[in-house]
């Protein structure tokens, strides 16, 4: 048995570090890295289990160009919605891979703390519960892995929480206080659940690790890339400058736009996601947040 992590950014490297503790594991990325067990993409794709951390907006093209269906089992560790076709990641992967061979990782985790071996809990989500259990067994003891079959619920939570995290960063950047941020995050959870239930997600997913757990973490910590985007927006910095200085992908930016488009098409009420998109497009941040906090 062998595992290959695809993508050697901070998140991919952290997962490689964790999986390597008890398993034979290699890592690969588009750009060669000076790290142990780094292999070419061709070698990585020969492994039995793949862990994909490819940015959401690049996933469809990457699969078209690189993936040869050899029956591998895949754990998708990215989060977001493709803005080109408004598809969730599970829908994109299912165009190329049998759903029985797919699992999706969710839950409140930061790469930095995984590298420090600090305890955490996460969820392996799959329509194939035997596969979910298999991937859960790969994690070291300080990473408690649960399983779920609510793939769409996990996908909605993983994407949506990044949008609320931008709003949380804006709220803190404006100095509105802990009360305001807590109100915004709580209402964000309700909005996220409303959006997810439209697509058939289970209620309990939003109250667990994939939903409330990941949302509360991501929307209130400086370790969150999307939260830091919000801080920059509150300081009236240009979005391009914020993203360049970040040096990593902040999926919430594209996800806010995708959610707004989907919500308009489906008639779903998503005031926070809509206002985040407006602020990303240049609307005055103080007026936007004031409007959100004043809604009934």
Model-identified regions with their sequence ranges:
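NAD(P)+-binding Rossmann beta1-loop-alpha1 motif at the extreme N-terminus of oxidoreductases
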Residues: 1-49
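Structural beta-sheet core signal
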Residues: 5, 27, 74-76, 104, ...
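Rossmann-like NAD(P)(H) cofactor-binding subdomain of soluble oxidoreductases
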Residues: 12-16, 41-117, 132-136
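Internal alpha-helical scaffold of NAD(P)-dependent oxidoreductase catalytic cores
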Residues: 47, 65, 92-101, 119-205
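A general structural signal for well-ordered alpha-helical segments in protein cores
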Residues: 59, 86-90, 132, 163, ...
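General beta-strand structural signal in soluble alpha/beta enzymes
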Residues: 76, 101-106, 145-149, 207-208, ...
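NAD(P)-dependent Rossmann-like dehydrogenase/reductase catalytic/cofactor-binding core
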Residues: 168, 197-201, 205-207, 211, ...
